[in-house]
Structure formats: C-alpha cells, structure tokens
C-alpha cells in the first residue's frame, strides 16, 4: 500500500513537472490551474488519510505487542565488578575534622586557636596595638571567608 501511494504521488509530480516545463505556454497555464484547483485538495486529503492510517496502524502494533514483555535475568551483574566488594573500613578512616566543618562553634574555636597560635609564634603577643588587632582581625575575616 505504501509503495502504491508513493508511486502514484511520484507519477503525478512528474506529470505536473513535465507540463510546467514544456515549451508551450498553454500547458504551463493549464498545469498551474490544475495544480491550484481541486486536484490539490484531493491530493492533500489522500495524503492525510494515508498518513493517519499509517499512524493508527503503528499504534495498534505497539498496543498489541506490550503483552510479550519478559524480564531478562541474564547478565545482571555486568555493570558491577563482582570480584570487588565495598570497602567496609573506609567509613572508619574518615577523620573527625570533616564533621567539625558542619559544626560552626567547633570551627570558629579551631580558627581562633589557630590565629592565637600565629600571634604567639610571631612574637606580637608582647607588643599589642590597634594596628596589630586590625591586621589580625582582617586575616581572621579572610580565613573565615575562605572556609566557606
């Protein structure tokens, strides 16, 4: 059925092209008149009917074929490597500092201890002034922003 409809469309298109590009002007006018008149609407209706028939037929084929589904139980472990098991000891190796990043009180206390240890190591603990305070507070602020 598909081949027959396509052959008839191909035949009519080749006939119209020959009439259009022929030497005599009367054939050119007649072919345009034929092409623009009722022939075009009949051709469009037939093509729409053909396309809807094909889509309905394909939907019926799909709906009738759903009953034949079966699960494939073979090769279920292809995506997994069966010789490698999950390392159960990895969760025990995670250090506790990862948990402290979520706890803001612990995080701030550790950062403040780190800043105070830097102050003690640099020798600024004996000579404390406002400029040192502003410098270290700026450093503390930069560290806190970089942690987030």
UniProtKB/Swiss-Prot annotation:
This is Putative uncharacterized protein YLL044W. Keywords: Signal. Almost completely overlaps RPL8B. It comes from the Eukaryota. Residues 1-22 form the signal peptide.
